[in-house]
């Protein structure tokens, strides 16, 4: 039985078995020592499918896949970031249960991609339009924030805080400039 487990480990590229029985997948970036962690899966086939999806994103459709009869089809695959590659790999690996042919997995990916676009546009529409129209005078959630901007801006503010005053007055005592120290006993 142990012999079959070791043969399963070497059966798929980019897949290995953990001590506790989970199958994990990771892929090395081209011309780099860095790797992208693709996740842990219940079966070696799911982990291998995740590897295939990441391989497609990094190398294109001419790469040597674990399942050459069922290659992944990921729109915009060559232009994805690491986190997007990780997400596409997980999606492709978990779509294996639903599709016996390659087409159903593609439809699932397209659905979830369009759903995420809807959520993003919905989220963006909920944000306040800070600064639209009158730029700095409108602060959305912080009304009145800009009420004092005229009093403390420009030359008038610089004159009020001018370092040219030659004395500082504390209570009844007046100190000449520079003679007051913190530890002067």
From Swiss-Prot:
Transmembrane segments: none annotated. SMART domains: AP2 (SM00380). Residues 11-68 bind DNA. GO terms for cellular component: nucleus. It holds the Pfam family AP2. The keyword Transcription regulation applies. One of its GO terms (molecular function) is DNA-binding transcription factor activity. The keyword Transcription regulation applies. InterPro entries: AP2/ERF_dom, AP2/ERF_dom_sf, AP2/ERF_TF_ERF_subfamily, DNA-bd_dom_sf. Its main location: nucleus. It is found in: Nucleus. Keywords: Activator, DNA-binding, Ethylene signaling pathway, Nucleus, Transcription, Transcription regulation. One of its GO terms (biological process) is ethylene-activated signaling pathway. Probably acts as a transcriptional activator. Binds to the GCC-box pathogenesis-related promoter element. May be involved in the regulation of gene expression by stress factors and by components of stress signal transduction pathways. Belongs to the AP2/ERF transcription factor family. ERF subfamily. This is Ethylene-responsive transcription factor ERF017.
């Amino acid at each position: 039985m142990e012999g079959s487990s070791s043969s399963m480990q070497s059966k798929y590229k980019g897949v290995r078995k953990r001590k506790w029985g989970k199958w994990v997948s990771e892929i090395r970036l081209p011309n780099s020592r860095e790797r992208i962690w693709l996740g842990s899966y219940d079966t070696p086939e799911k982990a291998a499918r995740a590897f295939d999806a990441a391989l497609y994103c990094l190398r294109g459709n001419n790469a040597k896949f674990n399942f050459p009869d069922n290659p992944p089809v990921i729109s915009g695959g060559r232009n994805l970031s690491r986190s997007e590659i990780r997400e596409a790999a997980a999606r492709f690996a978990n779509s294996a249960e639903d599709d016996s042919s390659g087409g159903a997995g593609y439809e699932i990916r397209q659905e979830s991609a369009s759903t995420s676009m809807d959520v993003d546009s919905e989220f963006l529409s909920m944000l306040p339009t800070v600064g639209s129209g009158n730029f700095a005078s409108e602060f959305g959630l912080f009304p009145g924030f800009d009420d004092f901007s005229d009093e403390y801006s420009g030359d008038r503010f610089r004159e009020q805080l001018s370092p040219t005053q030659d004395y500082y007055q504390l209570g009844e005592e007046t100190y000449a400039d520079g003679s007051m120290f913190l530890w002067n006993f």
